[in-house]
Amino acid sequence: MTHTLRVIFAGTPEFAAAALAAIHDAGFAAPLVLTQPDRPAGRGMKLQASAVKRYALEHGLPVAQPPSLRRAGKYPAEAAEAIELLRATPHDVMVVAAYGLLLPQEVLDIPRHGCINIHASLLPRWRGAAPIHRAIEAGDAETGVTLMQMDAGLDTGAMIQASRIAIAPDDTTATLHDRLAADGARLIVDALARLERDGTLAATPQPADGVTYAEKIGKHEAALDWRKPADVLARQVRAFDPFPGGVATLDGAAIKIWAAEPATGRGDAAPGTIVEAAPDGVIVACGTGALRVTQLQKPGGKRLPAREFLAGSPLAAGQRFALPDAG
């Protein structure tokens, strides 16, 4: 099926690529795709294209990669050029998903039907850069995807549609991300079809109550503070998979913790102390309870289940992981 609605798409990571693919597969024209500039990544730090750029190029969609859309920012000339490109590209609506650049009011005003954002939370909870991570870290029972009509605020626009998803006890950011991306793709295609049919989309202002912010994840947050309760640390490990992972330091070596669950058997051991190192998991004492670590990675190594890790890097009861500086 082909559609008459023309969609400029702005997004960068896999979450956004899923939405772009759904829009394209549904038959909506995408006369322009915006994504962030290629970034160095991987061990070789070679420039890599975003997931959105890769999809667009594979399907013959025009791509632009401005470093900014703000005339008053660090790249005024590039921003001005990008804004002129937007004005010169015939389109009806812009869809934005995890783009990573601020859209000033000047840009929001260009599309006839404005800009629709696909946000991976149940707004107004978890506005901001890392809603999936923060929902798991906080122990939320559910999250979801919200479509909103963008305004100049940070994820403050009126809500068009939302979908709820339960957070499973073993969900990581990686697994939850994939379900949310699929839901977001489904929602945006449905909304675009309604917009084409009706010429408008009803939207409801976000409530003033329940606002929280999902700050961007920093590498410094990876360190596991064994003084915390075991259930808190287990959520942290799940929330930080795939990035930045949980980090436990032993004798100066940073060991990444990729899977863990609360366990019994702490005894009176000090936080960070290895209580047991068994093939089914390494039990570490926490501030409250104990954590059974079931997947680890030594520096320069691969993720391994506890059995394989211990075969090459033995650990023993009584060893103690370092405690990070408080605060």
Curated annotation (Swiss-Prot):
Check the record and name the PROSITE patterns matching this protein.
GART
Gene source species = Burkholderia multivorans (strain ATCC 17616 / 249)
Q: Which residues form the signal peptide?
A: none
- GO MF annotations, alphabetized: methionyl-tRNA formyltransferase activity
From what superkingdom does this record's organism come? Bacteria
Give a short account of what the protein does.
Answer: Attaches a formyl group to the free amino group of methionyl-tRNA(fMet). The formyl group appears to play a dual role in the initiator identity of N-formylmethionyl-tRNA by promoting its recognition by IF2 and preventing the misappropriation of this tRNA by the elongation apparatus.
| Protein name (database record) | Methionyl-tRNA formyltransferase
Annotated EC: 2.1.2.9
InterPro entries membership: Fmt, Formyl_trans_C, Formyl_trans_C_sf, Formyl_transf_N, Formyl_transf_N_sf, Formyl_transferase-like_C_sf, GART_AS, Met-tRNA-FMT_C
Q: Which NCBIfam families match?
A: fmt (TIGR00460)
- Record's family? Belongs to the Fmt family.
Please tell me one Gene Ontology term that the record gives under cellular component.
Answer: cytosol
- Entry keyword set: Protein biosynthesis, Transferase
Q: Which reaction does it catalyse?
A: L-methionyl-tRNA(fMet) + (6R)-10-formyltetrahydrofolate = N-formyl-L-methionyl-tRNA(fMet) + (6S)-5,6,7,8-tetrahydrofolate + H(+)
Where, in this chain's numbering, is (6S)-5,6,7,8-tetrahydrofolate bound? S121, L122, L123, P124
